[in-house]
């Protein structure tokens, strides 16, 4: 178990925070990829400019 001194205000150790950040960033990247593909599909189907 981590010492109280090793924890940040979130209660996570540095290793746990880095792992959570990596998972969050991969989910964000997937969301952005889907959003870009959806925008391209709509732009091909019905251009808005």
From Swiss-Prot:
Q: What is its main location?
A: membrane
Ranges that cross the membrane: 23-45
Which biological process terms from the Gene Ontology are attached to this UniProt entry? photosynthesis, light reaction
The chain's Periplasmic topological domains, given as residue ranges, are: 46-49
- Please indicate if the UniProt record lists Membrane as a keyword: yes
Q: Cite the ranges annotated as topological domain Cytoplasmic.
A: 2-22
Q: Where does a bacteriochlorophyll bind?
A: 21, 39
What UniProt keywords are attached to this protein's entry?
A: Antenna complex, Bacteriochlorophyll, Cell inner membrane, Cell membrane, Chlorophyll, Chromophore, Light-harvesting polypeptide, Magnesium, Membrane, Metal-binding, Transmembrane, Transmembrane helix
Q: Which family does it belong to?
A: Belongs to the antenna complex beta subunit family.
> What does the subunit section of this Swiss-Prot or TrEMBL entry state?
The core complex is formed by different alpha and beta chains, binding bacteriochlorophyll molecules, and arranged most probably in tetrameric structures disposed around the reaction center. The non-pigmented gamma chains may constitute additional components.
State the name under which the record lists this protein: Light-harvesting protein B-870 beta chain
Query: Which species does this protein come from?
Result: Rhodobacter capsulatus (Rhodopseudomonas capsulata)
